[in-house]
Amino acid sequence: MTMETISQQQTKFIGHRGCRGTYPENTIEGFKKAIAYGTDGIEWDIIVNKDKEIIISHEPFIDTTYCQPLNKEIGFTKKNLYEMSTDEIKLIDCGGKFYERFPNQEKVIESKPLLVDVEKELLGYEGIVLFEIKSEPSLVTEYYPNPKEYADIIYNHVKNSPLKLNYIYMSFDPEILNELYTLMPKERYVLLEYNPFKCFSKLKESLNFTPHAFGLNYKIITPKFVHKSHKENIEVFAWTVNEIEMSNELIKIGVDAIITDYPNLIKHE
């Protein structure tokens, strides 16, 4: 892909964790609703549990701001998902509790799904799936497997996945991306970053390969960064954009994908 090809592409719109603004995040129904809004793709987050199964979840722990036990009398006996079995995780409701940050979110009892179950429900889906791998070096062994083991778990699952061709792998942790690239050098990867002081060259140097894209907090994206990325055939993804005016500004400077909690509002005109 050349710089000219990149610049001619239409900006893509991606539903962040499904459609978090209106439906509980990282749920099968949320992904389906985002797709129904006409998005170019959806984004989800993955972690690994005690059984070494891949769970769709943004946090490696139970976030009580939006999750609650199905049985309130028993409550939570554990909160670290890496120490919990699949059956234990099914007893967590992450949709029925009022979520102050997203007051218009539909309230429905929803559990954190297994990746394999999401894939079955989305069989035949042709859009993009941004497959974000949650990992923090300081939390490895306590909340996450080490990067090599983590990459092996992901690889052994996705190599036979019906959505394999849809996936674009993302992470804030360059080490997990480097490990995955060793196993799957033909796949697409996105390095995520929120630090405004991390320059283009430092981002590139953290990887052993040239990524498909850099995914930046929209507040730190500049026309200069977009131009420099495109010059090296690297796309730029913006997260998380929830205002139409900001979306339009990012489109003007050539951002390739906009990730939003409100795919019902931030979309193709």
Language model: regions and residue ranges:
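Phosphate-group recognition and catalysis centered on beta-loop-alpha active-site segments
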Residues: 1-269
